[in-house]
């Protein structure tokens, strides 16, 4: 993705395809997907302008790259949505990482034109299982993301 430096959607599809293949061949024990969305991002753009919104996306992307280093993959799925992929990470590890990620996002203000912009994110997490397809695991993570939005935002739904 040119703005964030993260994988784009197409690159992540390829990565996910490879991981699913490894999972079905029993080369991976677990495979978990998380869909995340910046809460009230439209408000950031409307209040501070689209350049500020771009800076929020870049700042969070740098944070994601640091956190995800050697743990998994992250891409900008579109707009203010991000998809995370955790191969061979058990659910306890995923929950700990997601909890840390929520805290880090909350405590990483974005400096734009001498103003600090604070954002939060909501996530939906789904573990890949034998009855999933690539599309269905993403759809289920996305469905859980929207449950999190409906139940107050700034949270992770498993």
Regions found by a protein language model. Give the residues of each.
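A short pre-motif secondary-structure segment
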Residues: 73-76, 117
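Active-site-flanking beta-strand signature of metal-NTP-handling nucleotidyl enzymes
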Residues: 32-37, 74
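Short catalytic/binding micro-motifs of nucleotide second-messenger systems
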Residues: 22, 66-71, 103-115, 145-147
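Active-site-proximal alpha-helical element of nucleotidyl cyclase-like catalytic domains
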Residues: 18, 52-73, 81, 100, ...
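Short regulatory alpha-helical coupling segments
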Residues: 9-29, 61-69, 87
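Catalytic-core segments of nucleotide cyclases and related cyclic-nucleotide turnover enzymes
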Residues: 46, 91-95, 99, 113, ...
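Conserved nucleotide-binding and Mg2+-coordinating catalytic segments in signaling enzymes
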Residues: 1-14, 36-50, 58
């Amino acid at each position: 993705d040119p703005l964030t430096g993260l994988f784009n959607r197409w690159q992540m599809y390829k990565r996910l395809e490879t991981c699913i293949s490894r999972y079905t061949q029993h080369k991976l024990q677990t495979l978990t997907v998380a869909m995340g969305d910046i809460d009230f991002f439209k408000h950031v753009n409307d209040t501070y302008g689209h350049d500020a919104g771009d800076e929020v996306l870049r700042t969070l992307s740098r944070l994601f790259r640091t956190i995800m280093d050697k743990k998994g993959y992250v891409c900008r799925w579109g707009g203010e949505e991000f998809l995370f992929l955790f191969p061979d990470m058990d659910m306890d590890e995923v929950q700990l990482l997601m909890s840390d990620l929520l805290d880090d996002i909350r405590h990483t203000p974005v400096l734009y034109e001498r103003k600090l912009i604070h954002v939060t994110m909501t996530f939906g997490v789904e573990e890949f299982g034998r009855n999933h397809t690539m599309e269905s695991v993403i759809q289920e993570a996305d469905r859980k993301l929207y449950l999190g939005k409906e139940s107050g935002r700034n949270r992770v739904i498993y």
